Amino acid sequence: MEKDEEFGGISDAIEISASWSKIKGIYYEIEKYFNQRNIVVASHFSHAYTHGISSYSIFYVNREDEQQAIDEFYKIWNDIMELTLKMGGSISHHHGIGMIKNKMLKKELGPGYGMLRDLKDAVDKNNILSRGKLI
């Protein structure tokens, strides 16, 4: 960014999924989270199945200070992931984990994370495939 450019804020989409019995509660808690912080959010549901559905929350953080906006951006991601897991949802659906959600994967998978680690070690003994990106 050029020094004379004005910082406009940060926008992103958070994708989560949950069973039908849990999605309503998670959705309302996510909306409440953003509304309490006066953060613009637009959410929608997609990819519905007999066992559950995915939800997207597109948010926009606009602060005068660029670093403050960046810090808030990462706090939002962490808080929404924690909230989703606490309420029994999943931190992803079909878009994968990625770098931001990576630190929450172990928490979501529990003991299954060790199995995934062992599989990666067996297939990639030299640790050259996506080093540090997933596990």
Predicted regions and their residues:
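A glycine-rich phosphate-binding loop feature that marks nucleotide/adenosyl-phosphate handling sites
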Residues: 46-54, 58, 94-102, 132-135
